[in-house]
Amino acid sequence: LVLKNVYIVTTNCVGLVTGGSVSELWSRHRELADAVAREVISIQAALTGRTFDADALIEGMLKAFDGDPDHKCMGRSAPARLARAIQQADEAGLDIPRLRGIAAAQQTT
């Protein structure tokens, strides 16, 4: 379930900025996608009270990308998922600068 959340929240939130497919996300916006995935993993760790191997989860996310490379990053639930991730991070006292940057960019457009 954690891997599924990493995939969905990362692709939806980064997709708010980049649009496109998951294969384009990784090929054109890897640094942002990796940073956001790591923030999402920290949120998942706080929610579950467990620690996770971020590199292994990101590898799992990439395997999912390979399974459906043309899958679109952003659906209509993306803004709500971003808001929920920020709320969860706030409740856990986590530093999530990339997710906050995406939210700030959404407010100015």
Annotated model-derived regions:
Residues 34-109:
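NAD(P)-dependent Rossmann-like dehydrogenase/reductase catalytic/cofactor-binding core
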